[in-house]
Amino acid sequence: MTQTFDPITLELLWRRLISLVDEAAAALVRTSFSTLVRESYDFSCIVTDDAGQSLVQATESIPSFIGTLPATVKHFLRFFPPDQLAPGDVLVTNDIWLGTGHLPDITVAKPIFRNGRLVAFSASTAHAPDIGGKIRSPEPREVFEEGFQIPPMKLMRAGGTDETLVTLLRKNVRTPDQTLGDLWAQVVALDLMEERVTALMDAYALPDLRALAAEIHGRCETAMRAAISALPDGTYRSELQTDGVLDKPVTIRMALTIDGDTIDIDYAGTDPQVDRAINCAMCYTYAMSVYGVKVCTSPTLPNNEGAFRPIRIRAPEGCIVHPQFPASGGSRMLIGHYLPMLVFGCLGQIVPDRVMAAYGSPMWGMNQSGVRDAMAGEPSKPYANMFFFNGGMGATLRGDGQTCLSWPSNVSSTSIEISEHISPLRFRHKRLRPDSGGAGKHRGGLGQEIMIESRSATPIAVSFLAERTIFPAFGIHGGSAGAPGVLRINGEAVDPKRQYVLQRGDTVLLATPGGGGHGDSTVRDASSLQADLRAGYVSGNETGRHA
């Protein structure tokens, strides 16, 4: 007999599940070693049912992992069917096509058993501080250049660690203590989720999670289908160009078809994959596409498998959003972060009040690799790290774009104090970019300007994640484009898709793009303009542009 739940019990169980993954996420942050997890929150924790279908995701998670993480658990099940799993096993991979689209993201999952029967998985993805290979940049031509590849395998068997894998990983990364420290922090999070899930099942006498999963998935699927059904049927198209590589832009095309209570997204006509590391694996394409649909149709709906069942994503094999092995993809967000904008371009034709102008993303980042000078009590040693810098969001019908906010990712920036402590870099300044937000009835969010100086006694290799230096974030409904991004080394403009070496005293200037404006700037509220002037968001000689 199928177990049923009254509304109150269902809500209690659902909220308990969300609470336990949030608790695991907090534990991961508190036990992690790298700033990418501890400060930037570049990770996710989920619980799935026994088939790998996501039930709940931690509240403060990376949006793309909503789509990639449960898919990876399903891939684990293909490699390790239930009869090949045991209590205490921990599965691991960073495979580009089975994971998140680039090697630095390490995914782990732990089967949860009850009375000898597989009932669920706890799982986590986290961005490792280093995964070996060439310093992360758009330059690698094949995945083999990008670092240490971990096929789907067991990190732990019945509670025992695969020391061979650990030794290989330690030998192949620049920051073994941080990389392995974060990996074990992920395992701690898995253990905590397992403990809390089994306690919840005991408290409510649940023999398994299938009935609960069916309720959660069914309700979210119904809600998403209802939201889609409220939209007019039809095929809507959009396309855009990215800065691309080697002075050649990349064109991405989308056709979004609404048919009753389903949405079909097709990337036919998109440019082919390239021999640079901006290729966006299908797993990431799927995740960014469904996320764009969700924020336009049902943004408050909890994230789980049911919410995405009515959405289908297709792309031709070999195009840049469905690259084939051995394509490189370490900088896949330089393509993937544009995909929600394409969804907005399609849905904005029928629900213009729900979309924003173009945003100043893909997010910017600065990768560094070198030798950190000896510090008090510590010898000099290799280091590798990454700092994120965000541009401005696009304006909407409701108001101005948010300033320096990461979207469609939601990573945080590492504080200057911590950044300077862990690296031989000095931040000369970090400030908002006046006049960078696109003019409009509602102004685009501002970008920021960061000046960094190398204080290292030895050379530092640096590379960047940077877009919208050629094509700025456009405005909509009469709004103006935001300011394009700027990247300079020692005052000279440089190609953001290349790797460089900094000597002591060299400086890097990163000026992130502003978001696009919304509506005619000539009807901007006078009080809003005066507030912008007082805050320094616009300058006196730019008032005409922002009036």
Regions found by a protein language model. Name each.
Residues 1-87, 92-547:
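Glycine/proline-enriched, intrinsically flexible loops and inter-domain linkers
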